[in-house]
């Protein structure tokens, strides 16, 4: 059986209740290795510890070329705010075939469900 994909949630300034319900969290934990950090941006140490295994990144985590070079498995970066901060090397992400998506500005249940659906489909190469 294939290893479960690592989905990394770093959705500051969104809180846990805005990102997923307990049911969604439980389902994500069944199909993926789920790491999340709430209350502030994830510390660089936490990101660096997991960067090589992250397949789906949800949040505003800085992803310059140097970090993208380390992220061998990443398939998608899903922004949770209504902006496009210059903290991602968008050109390099595009060159590598990494999807950069946005669920912002709404964090309504339908949008959250769409993000979960994107994460599942990307993790299964659909």
Regions found by a protein language model. Give the residues of each.
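N-terminal glycine-/charge-rich "phosphate-binding" loop or analogous flexible N-terminal tail
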Residues: 1-54
């Amino acid at each position: 059986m294939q290893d479960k994909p690592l989905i990394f949630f770093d959705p500051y300034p969104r809180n846990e209740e805005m990102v997923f319900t307990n049911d969604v969290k439980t389902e994500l934990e069944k199909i993926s290795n789920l790491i999340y950090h709430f209350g502030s941006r994830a510390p660089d140490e936490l990101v660096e510890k997991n960067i090589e295994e992250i397949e789906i990144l949800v949040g505003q985590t800085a992803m310059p070329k140097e970090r993208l070079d380390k992220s061998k498995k990443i398939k998608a970066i899903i922004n949770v705010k209504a902006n496009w901060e210059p903290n991602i090397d968008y050109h390099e992400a595009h060159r590598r075939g990494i999807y950069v998506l946005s669920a912002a500005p709404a964090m309504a249940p339908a949008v959250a469900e769409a993000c979960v659906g994107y994460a599942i489909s990307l993790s299964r190469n659909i």
